[in-house]
Amino acid sequence: MNKHKKIPLRKCVVTGEMKPKKELIRVVRSKEGEISVDPTGKKNGRGAYLTLDKECILAAKKKNTLQNQFQSQIDDQIFDELLELAEKVKK
């Protein structure tokens, strides 16, 4: 009998698409309220997943999607870091 390994799926908060966890990037808000990018997906706190795509990240910034998810202000530095990661993955 062939056993298939279960692939964890997560929903992108911008597009609403279910994708494999490895195709998405996690942004996390810690208990202290600090928001950071979590490339490993292991940090503690409230997480939100974004598709690692420039258009998706810019749409999240424009629509304030992450601010609504975390109910707190998001620095432009977080979006810059996400865009940088998207560029690295694209190459």
Swiss-Prot record:
It comes from the Bacteria. It holds the Pfam family YlxR. InterPro entries: YlxR, YlxR-like_sf, YlxR_dom. This is Uncharacterized protein YlxR.
